[in-house]
């Protein structure tokens, strides 16, 4: 029979490993139509849609009123992310329509 201390240590180790796997999985995005690499070009920022499609834009787009409003909506819906990508609360089709109609 295992002692309590050893059992607690083992459980903590498993929790840490599980947390690391969750973090790794949450950052993998395979459905990218705008850019296929995970690296971003210098001077660009990336957002993801609710259906996990990746969009990369030049930083100069941050001054665009439509982009600013979309980021405010994302902040209200999900909060400001401290880790991970910025996610917009709608699908890629609606996002594409929003930015193309401007």
From Swiss-Prot:
One family name in Pfam for this protein: Auxin_inducible
Membrane topology: Peripheral membrane protein
Name assigned to this protein: Auxin-responsive protein SAUR68
Gene name linked to the record: SAUR68
The organism of origin for this protein: Arabidopsis thaliana (Mouse-ear cress)
Function, as annotated: May promote auxin-stimulated organ elongation, such as hypocotyls, stamen filaments and petals.
Stated family: Belongs to the ARG7 family.
GO annotation (BP), single: auxin-activated signaling pathway
Keywords: Auxin signaling pathway, Cell membrane, Developmental protein, Growth regulation, Membrane
One CC-aspect GO term: plasma membrane
Subcellular location: Cell membrane
PANTHER family, per the entry: AUXIN-RESPONSIVE FAMILY PROTEIN, AUXIN-RESPONSIVE PROTEIN SAUR61-RELATED
